[in-house]
């Protein structure tokens, strides 16, 4: 396969599998320090996170939703998002809900 996935996401998911809460926190903190991540890597890593964490573990998932929303200009220019959305997964419904909430928050500020 050889596709790039963010290392801290893999570490977080392994820590989830083995119940290592401190390692999960560290991996999530380190993940938040990264910048300039290509859109395709973000989406692949988000898909990996969704495939390897339970629905009840929202920390890593929320991180990816926020990252996609913050990077929305990049995703608008990228054909990667359209292709991924056509494949469909729970990630995209969660993203829709998160973006609606984000828009509601912006509306309330005005």
Regions found by a protein language model. Give the residues of each.
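BTB/POZ-protein C-terminal extensions
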Residues: 1-17, 21-110
């Amino acid at each position: 396969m050889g596709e790039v996935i963010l290392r801290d996401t893999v570490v977080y998911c392994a820590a989830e599998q083995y119940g290592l809460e401190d390692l999960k926190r560290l991996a999530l903190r380190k993940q938040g320090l990264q910048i300039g991540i290509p859109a395709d890597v973000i989406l692949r890593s988000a898909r990996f996170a969704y495939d390897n964490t339970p629905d009840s573990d929202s920390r890593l998932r929320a991180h990816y939703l926020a990252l996609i929303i913050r990077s929305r200009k990049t995703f608008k220019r990228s054909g990667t998002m359209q292709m991924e959305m056509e494949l469909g997964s729970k990630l995209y419904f969660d993203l829709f809900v998160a973006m609606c909430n984000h828009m509601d928050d912006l509306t309330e500020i005005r």
